[in-house]
From Swiss-Prot:
Glycosylation sites: 58, 97, 139, 161, 179, 200, 217, 232, 321
PANTHER family noted in UniProt: HERV-H LTR-ASSOCIATING PROTEIN 1
Gene behind the chain: Hhla1
InterPro entries: HHLA1
Keyword terms: Glycoprotein, Secreted, Signal
Biological source species: Mus musculus (Mouse)
Lineage per the UniProt record: Eukaryota, Metazoa, Chordata, Craniata, Vertebrata
Compositional bias of kind Polar residues: 384-398
Annotated localization: Secreted
Cystine bridges: none
GO CC annotation terms, alphabetical: extracellular region
Protein name according to UniProt: HERV-H LTR-associating protein 1 homolog
Main location: secreted
Length: 514
């Protein structure tokens, strides 16, 4: 009994210690698990939050840096584009064939509602390797909402059974394209409204052009335009071979090569490829620089000289010498011993034509004109001022450039008729692949043709064959896109020219309504 009592307290003590130790271990284990849970839960959350904040900051910074980089890249691209713009003289618009375009417009107008209003949209792109000109025609759903202030200039062309030749109008369209691509850029350049209207009161089908320049900011204007174009043409061509023309070399001012001359012996009509640099060698070039006022006025009147425009010197006469760049720059190597005199005035009514044109007979020129009228091809796009190659060749009998008389007051000649040859120094050599420096700022153009004040007025080159079939009004349309005010300034127009310049009153009202 005593032994049992003696052994009882240690057992109880041991049992109590065991329970205490067990409880201690259990509590410490629970505390350890709680700490582990807290360590597993709280620290990762804080770490992820910090990383998220860092990522957000880095993302915004990267986005801002990326936007700044894109802006810098865009600015640099625009700068590069500005330095690599190719002028229009390096673009061969002879590949444009707008005959199908005009025929499609006529078929649409004659088949549907006798009225077809459309937008001629011209967009051009440029690079070192190619150029692309897109010509699209969009149908206008409601032409009455067109603001006439944005399209102030209107030109109409009457197409009837008597005037069924579309070469003049297609030449006008080519000139519009050439004017809009005066500097090829990657922006929207030009917009013109074309309308084809047929009325029962007249036998004419009026093709009207409302010319105006606009951009992509005219959202209200483009809302009324159908999304898909009715007619869409894209012309691509390489320009790497004509990059030398922008550097002022004389390669573009050559008339024809020997191979072309051999091909022209059967007197087939072949248009020589002449760029604006060749046409710019025609007008008078003043050696002294023009005043700032003249430059400002010329830039305000004509911001960009259209392709194929012949400019005439219209500044006041001065005592400075006026020299003229010859037509055939490096073609004259030797002059014949006996120079032939050259007349200073030419009568267009003479059947044999101008003496400097080496034509075999009048029948050949008539056949050429008929062939030009019969073919549906376009006139040469450099302002339809390009003559056939054999017409552009100077006569071999003309010899050296003879000095001619010069009036003290140069007039504003509308179109060249006589090749004026003023005093050119005999010691001026014609070096191949070189061309005398010209001052393009001195070229100014007149709005409308004015009658010559004197018989021996200063003029440039003979009137081309293609120019003769154009009425004076259409000549001015293709040149400057000015209104038909030619007949007001020049009163000796024929009735046919006046009928082309002045629109009928009903048609004028119809155009005003639209």
């Amino acid at each position: 009994m005593q032994s049992f009592l003696l052994h009882c307290p240690p057992i109880r003590l041991c049992m109590g210690l065991a329970c205490i130790l067990f409880l201690w271990n259990a509590v410490s284990g629970l505390k350890g698990e709680g700490k582990k849970d807290k360590e597993m839960a709280l620290p990762p959350a804080t770490v992820s939050g910090n990383e998220g904040l860092k990522k957000e900051k880095n993302g915004s910074f990267l986005h801002a840096a990326e936007s700044v980089f894109k802006e810098k890249k865009m600015v640099k691209g625009l700068e590069v584009l500005a330095t690599t713009e190719l002028p229009a003289r390096s673009v061969d618009l002879s590949t444009l064939n707008l005959t199908e375009l005009v025929n499609g417009m006529l078929n649409r107008a004659l088949k549907d509602s006798k009225q077809f209003f459309s937008v001629l949209s011209i967009t051009s792109y440029s690079s070192f390797a190619f150029h692309k000109v897109s010509v699209a025609i969009y149908n206008i759903s409601n032409p009455k909402t067109v603001d006439p202030a944005k399209f102030p200039t209107r030109h109409c062309y009457c197409l009837s059974n008597r005037t069924n030749d579309l070469s003049d109008f297609t030449a006008l369209l080519v000139d519009i394209v050439g004017n809009s691509t005066s500097y090829l850029t990657e922006i929207f350049k030009s917009t013109s409204i074309l309308s084809v209207t047929q009325t029962n009161e007249s036998d004419c089908v009026f093709i009207c052009v409302m010319v105006g320049k606009s951009g992509r900011n005219l959202s209200d204007f483009w809302e009324m335009v159908e999304k898909s174009p009715v007619i869409n043409y894209t012309f691509t061509s390489g320009v790497s071979s004509v990059l030398a023309t922008t550097r002022g070399t004389a390669r573009t001012s050559r008339l024809t090569t020997q191979s072309q001359q051999s091909l022209l012996r059967p007197y087939s009509v072949r248009w020589s490829t002449q760029w604006v640099s060749a046409l710019k060698s025609l007008p008078w070039t003043k050696t002294s620089a023009p005043s700032e006022k003249e430059l400002a006025e010329s830039k305000q009147m004509f911001p960009e000289l259209p392709v194929g425009t012949i400019g005439t010197h219209s500044s006041a006469p001065s005592s400075s010498n006026m020299t003229r760049t010859p037509w055939g720059t490096n073609r004259y190597t030797q002059a014949p011993t006996v120079p032939m005199p050259m007349p200073l005035s030419v009568d267009d009514s003479t059947p044999e034509g101008p003496p400097w044109a080496s034509l075999p007979s009048t029948s050949a020129s008539i056949e050429d004109a008929q062939q030009l009228r019969s073919t549906g091809n376009l006139l040469h796009p450099t302002g339809i001022l390009t003559t056939p190659s054999r017409l552009a060749q100077p006569s071999r009998a003309s010899g050296t450039l003879m000095p001619g008389t010069q009036t003290t007051n140069p007039t504003q000649a509308p179109a060249p008729r006589v090749p004026q040859t003023d005093g050119i120094p005999a010691e001026w050599p014609f070096i191949p692949e070189k061309e005398p420096a010209r001052d393009p700022a001195a070229h100014q153009v007149s709005k409308c043709p004015r009658p010559l004040l004197q018989e021996e007025a200063i003029t440039d080159t003979p009137l081309p064959l293609a120019m003769k079939k154009l009425t004076p009004c259409l000549m001015e349309l293709c040149r400057f896109f000015q209104q038909c005010l030619c007949a007001i300034q020049k009163r000796d127009f024929s009735s046919e020219a006046i009928s082309n310049c002045y629109l009928p009153e009903k048609i004028r009202k119809l155009i005003t309504l639209h």
